[in-house]
Structure formats: C-alpha cells, structure tokens
C-alpha cells in the first residue's frame, strides 16, 4: 500500500505553499496570460522559434463553381433501374438502350454485377463499368 502524502499537505505552514511570492499565485499575471495570450506581443519569440507557421495564410480554396461534380450511378443499380422500369426503355437488336443523362446521371461506375445486354449512353464511364458492360454483351457510348 502506497503511503504518500499529497504535496499540499507537505506544504502546509510554509505560507506560500510552494508558489514563491504570494502574488505569483494570483490570476495568470505571472505567466504572461493564459493559453496563447500574448503570442503576437511579449511571447512572439517563442512563436517564431517553436511554431513559425502559426500566423499567415498559405494555399487556396478553389472556387466551388469551377469544381466539376458529376452525378454517378453504379452499373448494378442501373440494371436494377432497368428491370424496375422495363417499359420506359427501348430494345434494339436484343439490347436495352439506356441514356443515363435522361435519367439524371452523367457518369457510370463499375460496382455491382450485370447480366442484361445493354447499350449505355453517358458522359463518362469508369474502366470497370466499360469492362462489365462489354462482358455482358453490351456496349457503351460516350456523349
């Protein structure tokens, strides 16, 4: 069993309890303010030495209207969509013709499995989507 008395118990009766002069223990004046106070004034040298990149700007934020965000759909979801709304799509030469932009999607991604032969028209295709469409006996057309 550890028998160690607390520091404050040891310091009792020594008037300042280990804080030196009495006024050093009042508020945050003895340490020059709390936290990061004074980092552009009297603590500036410590900023220069230990954290020189704290102040100032670097890098940039790209204008959001310039960022191209495409609406995407996975090839597995596209097949489910086709099976759900069969009457909305045309069939040419045994292949279902799907225009992804008319449904509201610009890019076709390759997640999922397909068994239906289809002609898919979209702005962009991922490599996986191209492989899976051709493996199922279909074709892709980039608009």
UniProtKB/Swiss-Prot annotation:
Q: Does the keyword Cell inner membrane apply?
A: no
What superkingdom heads the lineage? Archaea
Q: Which UniProt keywords apply?
A: Ribonucleoprotein, Ribosomal protein, RNA-binding, rRNA-binding
| PROSITE patterns in alphabetical order | RIBOSOMAL_L15
One annotated GO molecular function is: rRNA binding
User: In its UniProt record, which GO terms are filed under biological process?
Assistant: translation
Region feature Disordered, mapped onto this chain = 1-38
Q: Name the InterPro entries on file.
A: Rbsml_uL15_N, Ribosomal_uL15, Ribosomal_uL15/eL18, Ribosomal_uL15/eL18_sf, Ribosomal_uL15_CS
Could you name the Gene Ontology cellular component terms for this entry? cytosolic large ribosomal subunit
Spell out the Basic residues composition-biased ranges. 1-14, 23-38
Q: List the disulfide bonds.
A: none
Subunit-structure text: Part of the 50S ribosomal subunit.
UniProt-listed PANTHER family: 60S RIBOSOMAL PROTEIN L27A, LARGE RIBOSOMAL SUBUNIT PROTEIN UL15
The similarity comment for this entry is: Belongs to the universal ribosomal protein uL15 family.
Function, in words: Binds to the 23S rRNA.
Fetch the HAMAP family from UniProt.
Ribosomal_uL15
- Report the protein name in the record: Large ribosomal subunit protein uL15
> Its gene?
rpl15
């Amino acid at each position: 069993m550890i028998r160690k008395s607390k520091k404050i118990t040891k310091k009792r009766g020594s008037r300042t309890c280990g804080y030196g002069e009495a006024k050093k223990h009042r508020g945050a004046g003895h340490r020059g303010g709390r936290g990061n106070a004074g980092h552009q004034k009297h603590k500036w040298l410590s900023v220069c030495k230990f954290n020189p990149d704290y102040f100032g700007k670097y890098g940039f934020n790209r204008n959001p209207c310039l960022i191209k965000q495409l609406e995407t759909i996975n090839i597995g979801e596209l097949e489910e969509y086709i099976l759900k709304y069969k009457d909305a799509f045309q069939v040419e030469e045994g292949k279902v013709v799907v225009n992804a932009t008319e449904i509201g999607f610009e890019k076709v991604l390759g997640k999922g499995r397909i068994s239906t032969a289809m002609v898919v028209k979209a702005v962009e295709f991922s490599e996986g989507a191209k492989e899976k469409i051709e493996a199922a006996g279909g074709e892709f057309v980039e608009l």
